[in-house]
Regions:
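Structural motif corresponding to alpha-helix initiation and N-cap regions
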Residues: 25, 59, 95-98
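Well-ordered alpha-helical scaffold segments within catalytic/enzyme domains
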Residues: 38, 42-43, 77, 111, ...
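Short, contiguous alpha-helical
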Residues: 29-33, 37-40, 50-90, 129-174
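Short, low-complexity N-terminal intrinsically disordered segments enriched in polar/charged residues
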Residues: 19-29
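Bacterial Sec-dependent N-terminal signal peptides
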Residues: 1-21
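Acidic/histidine-rich alpha-helical segments that form the ligand environment
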Residues: 94-129, 136-152
Length: 174
């Protein structure tokens, strides 16, 4: 009986120690690679000559959408990881061309990977400066980041479909 009880306690201790101490930040760290893959693939899928495409006059161009994703990643991830925001020596423009925007997009996701590596759930209630100088919690910035990724992918997918292209998540498995 003591042996069975010992085994049970050992298993219970193993399960208890295996529990993630940072469920929120760990979840976002798990989400990042998938969103990075899909967003980068979506921007790569659009032909270079379509980066000036906009569905209506009031909407941004596809190049502007790519630039917006880059800027959002750099801004929000700097707040999340308490790091200086990445600023290019020469500011990017939506007209900089596909190759330059794709490279900057990849770099922005690498920056987010670094920034997320510096935060854990104990820091989520810390106050950070958000858009327009407003104050909010680091948790708010984290949630805004994941919402942005979903929103931006949906926009990129729409732009692709309006140009007769399939977004990455709708393409047949290779």
């Amino acid at each position: 009986m003591k042996f069975i009880l010992s085994i049970f306690l050992l298993l219970a201790a193993t399960v208890a120690f295996a529990q993630d101490k940072n469920p929120v930040t760990s979840a976002v760290k798990e989400i990042l690679p998938r969103q990075q893959k899909n967003l980068v693939a979506a921007v790569e899928e659009m032909p270079a000559d379509k980066f000036a495409y906009r569905p209506t006059e009031q909407q941004m161009t596809f190049g502007h959408l790519a630039l917006h994703i880059i800027e959002s990643n750099n801004y929000l991830c700097s707040k999340i990881g308490d790091l200086p925001e990445v600023k290019a020596a020469v500011p990017l423009k939506e007209s900089d061309g596909k190759d330059k925007l794709v490279a900057a997009l990849k770099a922005s996701f690498e920056f987010c990977t670094t920034a997320l590596g510096k935060v854990d759930d104990s820091k989520l209630s810390d106050e950070v400066e958000l858009f327009g100088g407003r104050k909010g919690s680091r948790a708010f910035a984290l949630i805004a980041l994941t919402n942005d990724w979903a929103d931006h992918y949906a926009s990129a997918a729409m732009y692709l479909r309006l140009n007769g292209l399939l977004p990455p998540t709708a393409q047949p498995k290779k």
